[in-house]
Amino acid sequence: MGNVEIPNWLKALPLAPVFRPTDTEFADPIAYISKIEKEASAFGICKIIPPLPKPSKKYVFYNLNKSLLKCPELVSDVDISKVCKEDRAVFTTRQQELGQTVKKNKGEKGKSNSQRSGVKQVWQSGGVYTLDQFEAKSKAFYKTQLGTVKELAPVVIEALFWKAALEKPIYIEYANDVPGSAFGEPEDHFRHFRQRKRRGRGFYQRKTENNDPSGKNGEKSSPEVEKAPLASTSLSSQDSSKQKNMDIVDEMEGTAGWKLSNSSWNLQMIARSPGSVTRFMPDDIPGVTSPMVYIGMLFSWFAWHVEDHELHSMNYLHTGSPKTWYAVPCDYALDFEEVIRKNSYGRNIDQLAALTQLGEKTTLVSPEMIVASGIPCCRLVQNPGEFVVTFPRSYHVGFSHGFNCGEAANFGTPQWLNVAKEAAVRRAAMNYLPMLSHQQLLYLLTMSFVSRVPRSLLPGGRSSRLRDRQREEREFLVKRAFVEDILNENKNLSVLLREPGSRLVMWDPDLLPRHSALALAAAGVAGASAVSPPAVAKKELEEGHSELQNKEKTSLLEELSLFMEKLNDVYYDDDDGLLNDFQVDTGTLPCVACGVLGFPFMSVVQPSEKALKDLSERQGETDAQEIMTLSSEKSDCEWKTSSRYIRPRIFCLEHTIELQRLLQSRGGLKFLVICHKDFQKFKAHAAIVAEEVKVPFSYDDVLLESASQEELSLIDLAIEDEEKYEHSVDWTSELGINLRYCVKVRKNSPTKKIQHALSLGGLFSDTSQMLDFTTIRWLQRKSRSKAKPSSTSSFTPCEHLEVKADGKLRDNLDSQTGKKEEKIIQYSRKKKLNPKPSAEQVQELATLAKSKDFDKTCKNFSSRSHLDSAIRSEMNSEIGDSGRVIGVSFSINPCSSSFTVGHGQEHPEITVKFGSDLDGNVTNSLSMVNGDSADLTLTSISREQHQGHSMTSNNNGSNSGSHVVASQTILVSTGDNHDGPRKLSGDYVCSDVSVRGIQEAVEMSDQEFGEPRSTVTNIEDEQQSQIVKPTQREAVFGDHEQVEGAEAVSTRENLCSEIILHTEHSSAHVGMEIPDINTASENLVVDMTHDGEPLESSDILSSSNGDEASSNGLQVLNDELSMESEVSSSENTEVIEAPNSMGEAKKKRKIESESETNDNPESSIGFIRSPCEGLRSRGKRKATCETSLKHTETSDEEKKPIAKRLKKTPKACSGSRQQEVPTTTHPNRCYLEGCKMTFESKAKLQTHKRNRCTHEGCGKKFRAHKYLVLHQRVHKDERPFECSWKGCSMTFKWQWARTEHLRLHTGERPYICKVDGCGLSFRFVSDYSRHRRKTMHYVT
């Protein structure tokens, strides 16, 4: 077998994570799994290796045979009289198909014959085996497939398995879903679990008796009579084997299997573990709350599937050969279903049918297809003695490497609550009955965390070890979900109770008419069975007498110890008392619309008479006549119950609200909101729980009245009809809101694509018609070429601006679908504004822009077209997020200029063109794409009006107005038309862009502008570059009169000689360069970052006739850029500022904050103020850093305040100035008591300085700052302490934890009980504290 070729895809599959809990962590399985869930759920599966060796084969077989004997349905086909007791422990297997039936046709490689690829045949074979028999058959099959090779590498067997899946079919047997367990029953633990298990079995037994059809001759079969032969045979052999069983138990006590069975990881108890959401499930369901056994052979496989209700699952391999697992993370479940639908079921099948087919657990496809589709998948090899945990919504598949015996059960951590509701809807859509109500389980689990007696009254302090802290975190998540659910129900309730005629009543399931009759019948049966035979009564009296004598012999100390153990059980582990306080078995009702078992609020709904008349017009003559008759005869009756078609139905509150909106135009509906009587008990604790988890509890109290007898009858009728006529046609199916009816129709008639009227997570959507945004090529219109003007006057290309802001490509594109955002487009402009062009003018130019002649005349313009195309093609490959990706192409030329906005899904392209008419007036036009409107307001520039004071004509006829003297921010709304303002939905925090250069970059003379340059500045001039706060991000475009008022500045401030680009963001680092290009055009490169991610540089081309561009470039500084980021930037830079710049900076920040708060409200709804409206001119920059630091008042240029700017540091500037700049300063860094923590905001820093933890969900307060610093190890998982024992590599967060760990190596037991006569010693203080609490060994 050494020549087996391992596929490359199999070699590349990553391994799932493996965890090794310590003895302390192993004590609480739910707490430990909750701890690793964040890391492990990213893979969908993980392996946990317990700190105990695997159990022996003898121990496993003994417990499994003992468990199989308790299932009489497994031995129904065996003649008990002919076999011994061990041979009666049998199980049945299921035959599986592995391979493909391929029929080769001419010209084709092969096709699957009569069945789709990936769907395998699984059926009952009828084979009955004992463990020894099936093991022998498995070994024989192994030899036929692999020969005499005993051990093969797991990857080799995996390659052989997937190779066999593509070849001629072979048939394997697999004993799956066998009720039972190979764990031994724990001793003196989980007493309440065994009691509930008996109660659950009794519930199923009563249900079977009530629903069991009559046997032969019309007589009901009696379970007692059927079990009599088996019971008598068992009793006859019980005495002979009793001593043998006792010897085996004594022999196995203390072994690895015995220790594991008596731990919390015993799968018989995992579903009922403290902290598991499934702990309070009322029924005992095999495979969910009780484990099932899986006995396999070589290549026995289980199909791709998720667990019932998408719960967690825990699997333990007791003995035998390994198993291989493959899993897909839960985040890719929808993608996985789509790949399976297209490649295995065919594209004609819809999403719901594919989901149903996957639920049948017959789909076996290779992970190669999954990985090839871009979906991550991992593999895992489970060896005997190891646990495998799968997480909610994670699809997994696997197979066995030989004979083995495994076991599995379900449970749920608090994280399952995030998917519980959607999982219930998907289960109902697959036509499966719900097994649980996630709301009821949440409420009961929360109540189990609420102590009925304050824990402070318990003797002895609680331990603060890791297990207790994990328990507190687990309780926090559950309690917070509990409060949020109650508030959400209250919100829905408030909406419904505002409707006229609404009513809320409290109902008791025990008071329903039908339930009362059944209760009386059950009481009569119980009374008849209460008469015990004399022998049984005598035996009970003797047992009671002996028990009394034993109690008399019990010492006072033992009684106190027993009392404390029971008290601790009540507070922490025992839940029998809690179950007695609430009605667990009744009170959950399924919603017609979604199939979810609702609790505690539901509603009984019926259409109004007007709505019924509207429905009658759509029905046949018989139904319409019946509806009209009922409407006329019983018009005085509010509820109509005689017709099955219009019978009242049960809905959850959420879908009652949706149904009310749906029928609002048809006459509305009648509804009765019903509240379970236990809700008052839950609500009594809600305010206290909300205070514990720090959630505001704003609850609107409503009046709860007890339901009248008529209302109870109405509720009972609705429940009874749900059971009898769940698939029949009625008004809910007519409206398309009956989920089970929709599923039934789609299953029976696949051609009928019936749709559900309410939103159910897209289950009824046709995914084949959904857009795949990853394959969309975002269009970018090319720049217009230069046009040949008919006028004799010549023009020179003046400006070409191209801005590109790119964000990180996200994987989840559909989450951004539907977001309409305002984009910020920045362009250069002159100060003087013209009135807004008329609508006719815009429409005329838009028509002209679309004409072919216009395209031909402009195709030769722009020498930079090849650069534009390259940048646009690069942008097309990178755009993927509508919220963060903006592509803007902006150009201005005498004939036509346009800019293109490329962004997300809503508007792939928006083109706006500027044209110059023969008179020189710049006009605007707008081109709409995909039929969507884009509101845009641009400014027009009149050269005639501007020429007198800001523009001149040079000798060669070119327009000197091409100088960039200011920058204006324009907000373009790409959404629908709105009358009011809308806030920007993105996270862009963009300042007004002011362009300031140095004298070397742009040099303009005073004579060129027709007026002298002013050197007088004031404080207001310094504040023109403002930060755009979130409240200022409103895109409303009005007339230009509103803008002109905000842009009124002196003429001297418009004519700036320098350009600076400011981009305000919390983490933006901006750099600018202007390389040397010809005088006709200059290339400006801007480097930006957004949220810590680098944005690609975009080219900004500005031309100035006669201007010179410095190769050193423009230096840009963010006003709030930290000193640390300046020093650690990629280029060696330093901050150059005046000696009193720190004081000026503080004053400037204060003035900025005041100007922002006192700003005119109208300024937030018009154009953003240009930074050039108040720019001050400043002096030339000195050549060296020494001269740049000097402040000379005699020079006019040096009298101006020196602005803070970023400058390349020459090598000569490495003196004392660099030492003065702190290299590790940070605006939000803590320096208390040696603390060096940094924070995102000043608010968190202030909270931190108050000795309070800023981690989300924590908020703990400490009496000293050093304790807060140490506390951060909990959240950062820092482990600075290492075990000093040679060969041990364990690390610890705390010194005391390492000290206690060292006692495991040294054997030290320092804690000794000081009570006389005890003398027990303990290694850990927690064990000593527990001993004192249980035995009351306190020494005063």
From Swiss-Prot:
Listed SUPFAM superfamilies: beta-beta-alpha zinc fingers, Clavaminate synthase-like
Phenotypic consequence of gene deletion: Early flowering a reduced number of rosette leaves at bolting stage, but normal development of all other organs. Hyper-methylated genes with accumulation of H3K27me3 histone marks. Reduced FLC expression. Partially redundant with JMJ14. Brassinosteroid-insensitive phenotype.
Tissue: Expressed at low levels in seedlings, cotyledons and leaves. Detected in inflorescences, stems, roots and siliques but not in shoot apical meristems or root tips. Accumulates in flowers and embryos.
Residues at which Fe cation binds: 305, 307, 396
Compositionally skewed regions (Polar residues) per UniProt: 1099-1115, 1215-1225
Region annotation (Disordered) ranges: 195-245, 1092-1225
Annotated region described as DNA-binding, given as residue ranges: 1260-1333
Binding residues annotated for Zn(2+) 2, in chain numbering: 1253, 1258, 1271, 1275
GO biological process, one term: epigenetic regulation of gene expression
Residue span of motif Nuclear localization signal 2: 1248-1255
Keyword annotations of the record: Activator, Chromatin regulator, Dioxygenase, Iron, Metal-binding, Nucleus, Oxidoreductase, Repeat, Transcription, Transcription regulation, Zinc, Zinc-finger
Biased composition (Low complexity): 1124-1133
Protein name per its UniProtKB record: Lysine-specific demethylase ELF6
Gene that encodes it: ELF6
